[in-house]
Amino acid sequence: MKHKLFFLILAGILMTGNALADNQIKSAMSAAPASVSANAKVIDWNFKTLREGNNGWTCLPDRPDTPGNDPWCVNEPWLNFLNAYVKKEKPTYTEIGFAYMLMGDTPVSNNDPYATEPTSKEDWVTDLGAHLMMLIPNTDMLKNISTDHLNGGPWIMWPDTPYAHIMLPLENRQ
């Protein structure tokens, strides 16, 4: 009887873990069009593989510890960027990077990659819906692009940092 109870508990734990992984995979896949996410690798925010992929894209689920719904689908340069960002190191990508965030984002500083508290309206990005992001290895090429997230079009987020990238909103913003 004790063995049956043990196996029932173990089976319940395993099913709960599988359901959590399934939810994370579904969340991650919502970040990009199905043409990208259907065959993408899916990892969690500890960079543990939840599902293998075969198209060069990697998707990550919404981060439950942040406000907003913010899953990502990224190519290899963005994966390099995210690994460096998490470790507070300089990214080493050498190719153009693309990232999809079709579900939106969490509120974030436009200037300070590690800010955790809201700042001024001119800095704090709160209403960002679906968007794409681009990395350019030579960030000197970004100098003539606006850094104003309220300009109505593309802008540079985190300018003058190793994490500078182009934000491309896909929805109207106020």
Language model features with spans:
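Primary mode marks residue(s) on the alpha4-beta5-alpha5 output face of response regulator receiver
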Residues: 22-174
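N-terminal secretory signal peptides that target proteins for export/translocation
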Residues: 1-2
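Sec-dependent N-terminal signal peptides
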Residues: 5-13
